[in-house]
Amino acid sequence: MEAKMNKIDTNVVELEIKVDAKDFNEALKKSYNKNSKKFNIPGFRKGKVPMNMVKKFYGVEVLFDDAINACIDKTYGVALEENNVRPVDYPQIEVVEVGEGKDLVYKAKVTTYPEVTLGDYKGLEVEEVSYEVKEEDIEKQLADMQARNARVETKEEGTVENGNIAVIDFKGFIDDVAFEGGEGKDYPLEIGSGSFIDNFEEQLVGLKVGESKDVNVTFPEAYGKEDLNGKPAKFEVTVKEIKVKELPALDDEFAKEVSEFDTLEELKADLKEKAVKANELRAKREMEEKVINAVVDNAKVEIPEAMINREVENMVRDLEMRLGQQGLSLEQYYEFTGSTEDKMKSYMKENAERKVKTDLVMSAVTEAEAIEATEEELKAKAEEVAKMYSNGAETEKMVDLLLNAQRAALELDVKREKTLKMLFESLK
């Protein structure tokens, strides 16, 4: 086998590969053996037709396709390796010369991984990010805990007020015609929650139990249903019951009921400690994003369209999987959002291109710094992942499984973490 490489465009090369006539003839014999049962010639049992008779009656060309494919399978990978070519997609194959007793010559047009030209990535200046935990943040968390533990009681007298729960029957109309999904019975609506469209909830304030009212609203332009988007609607609403939330007192008894702490002060201290840690993690992630963005923006790389398209397909599959976990399909998603597959892919393309560039640039930094993952680091990462999904004896089994089946992914994670650490340590 011989292979010559020509660069024909940015990130595109053409390999001209020659397979020796002897090897091609061997491939023809294997093609004959593989397909022998398909040939029917009078005077011969099925599967017993000699090769020379097959060539006479059908022509030797009938054996070419399988023989050519076998030769390509055997030689294409070798040609890539010999010429240090990293493909990002399947090649475009063109057979140049083929014939019995002749060399097989074919061309493979290959889109390759792009070369990354790194800019400055060490000694960068990035504005530090930090978040303060304020007293009102803790008070809000306590208020949320109060609301979750509130007792709901029937309001015997009075009218609907903000913060009340109105139990309602409703039926919606557009142009005096009832629409699908616009009707509800005994629906508990918390006034002021913003869970209904427009100013629906505000219009119920002041109503008594048993009273009815026509509530006029307008659906948002991007509501998600073509027949409702931007349309004015009327809802016939009847208040059947009014409920109020009785919030528990914020005291030591409350702390004992909702946590493992004996006093309210201990509970508040715990909430603050957790908030500080959450803010530190948030700040760290934002700093990481800033550093990565700076490194990526300083680099230059021409990304092949094939890589972007592949990432878009990955994003679509990821969305489909997440929707499936919620019992939804892509088709339902398109209907709810008023989108289409083409629109969604077009929307995803910019993010896909950025992700591909980020991965390429960060890998180039890792390579430039000769950063490697040691066996100890791989095992530590495997243990970290395993502990998220198992415990005890099962953890050790999962560690072994990860080290064998997901070694490349673990290595990528470790290298990325070490690369980020190096970038942070070099910040001015």
From Swiss-Prot:
GO molecular function, one term: ribosome binding
Domain of life: Bacteria
Enzyme class: isomerase
Function field: Involved in protein export. Acts as a chaperone by maintaining the newly synthesized protein in an open conformation. Functions as a peptidyl-prolyl cis-trans isomerase.
Phylogenetic lineage: Bacteria, Bacillati, Bacillota, Clostridia, Eubacteriales
NCBIfam families, sorted: tig (TIGR00115)
Name of protein: Trigger factor
InterPro entries, alphabetized: PPIase_dom_sf, PPIase_FKBP_dom, Trig_fac, Trigger_fac_C, Trigger_fac_C_sf, Trigger_fac_ribosome-bd_bac, Trigger_fac_ribosome-bd_sf, Trigger_fact/SurA_dom_sf
EC number(s) reported in the record: 5.2.1.8
One GO-annotated biological process of the protein: protein transport
Pfam families: FKBP_C, Trigger_C, Trigger_N
